[in-house]
Amino acid sequence: MFGLTLFLLALDQVTKWLVRQNLAVNEAWAPFPALAKYFTITHVQNTGVAFGTLPGLGWVFMLVNLVVLVGILVYYPRIPAGEWQLRTAAALILAGDLGNVVSRLRTAALYSEVTGSIWSALPMASVTDFIDIKIWPVWNVSDMCVVTGVAIVAWTMWRWDRDERTGEAMSGEPMTNDQ
């Protein structure tokens, strides 16, 4: 888990850094000009939560991120080794969670030089979003990791429920009345 998590965390932080270094806030770049009406890299500083919702409340989400982080670290060792889907989902959610916490702490630290404390700077903390597909709010690698991880968990739970309803145990063996 930690290899995938660290790779995705690094990818998230590097891509955010590249965007901040090369584009002004609200500036867009079309890496594929023929597709510019469908996809651009657009530099957005998001003080809200996922996909830019609830602006200014990102600090609340950061607290939720910390609870999720602890939950994953506690729950992960309990995931059976054969449940690679759930292990992958946990790694993805952890990477996304950490990516946005690191980003918010980075910007809060920058603002704390003005406000005098990191606590008073937390409401201004933001993450860099940049993937703009025009039909959805701008997002980043962390958002992609969390959404994909949650989708895998939902799919896995649906599959388990379906298997139970069709009379199959999680092992794939037909269920009997004494199971």
Question: What residue spans do the PLM features occupy?
Answer:
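Alpha-helical transmembrane bundles and membrane-interface segments of multipass inner-membrane proteins
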Residues: 1-179
